[in-house]
Amino acid sequence: MSFEQGFNRLWHTIAGKFRKRRRERFVALFPPDKISSIVDLGGLVSHWDGEQRDITVLNLMPQESNHCKVLVGDGRHTDLPDRGFDLAYSNSAIEHVGKWQDQVAFAQELQRVGKLVYCQTPNRWFPLEVHYLTFFWHWYPKLLRNYFIVRYFTGWGWLVRPDRRRVQEYADTVRLLTYEQMKELFPDCSVERERFLGLTKSLIAIGEPSQNFARAEAPESRAGAPVRR
């Protein structure tokens, strides 16, 4: 087995355990008998395989599904109705939508369209940058984040073997958030810390928005690409 193959297997084993634990926590918080309609902003239909609820997935890219309603759109500005879903959900998407003002718009859309909110994102202060699968990557100077370094010296480069366009796309769109920023984006929600080895790996905003959010104005540019895990 090559080093890349071993790394791939190890990462998918660890990531799979986190997904399983997070899924169990999600079902406990939002049981199907109480939460029947869910909208996923910026998600993938494969995330909802086996789910029996009424699921709507909105993403920039077209997707096909036999079990989800699929919409093509920008999560920062949607035509979805106010409080039109029992739960507005997002998993590892808000860090991809652009600058701070784009993240504000995305967070407000989640709180506008859902009676309840669930928004997960990687923690900026976790030492391992989970998109590049490299320690301290998000703290390196931009000069080092070039194609050659990304392709041959990051875990993501080994696993995905991205082309130059995708490397640049990640560089332009990934903006990680802190606990304090998540509290600011979701003032009515509790922000849970998902830990690994005692360190906060991910942040999850969960709660019921108490204020009414107006639909945001249409953004000048489209939001970033979805995460593929």
Give names to the regions the model predicted.
Residues 1-82, 87, 199-202, 213-229:
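Conserved N-terminal segment of class I S-adenosyl-L-methionine
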Residues 87-93:
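A short beta-strand submotif of the Rossmann-like class I SAM-dependent methyltransferase core
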Residues 97-114:
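A short, conserved alpha-helix within the catalytic core of class I
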Residues 109-113, 120, 185:
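Conserved helix-to-beta-strand junction in the class I
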Residues 116-149:
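Conserved class I S-adenosyl-L-methionine
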Residues 132-135, 155-169:
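Short, glycine-/aromatic-enriched active-site segment of Class I SAM-dependent methyltransferases
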Residues 168-190:
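Short alpha-helix
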Residues 189-204:
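Conserved Class I S-adenosyl-L-methionine
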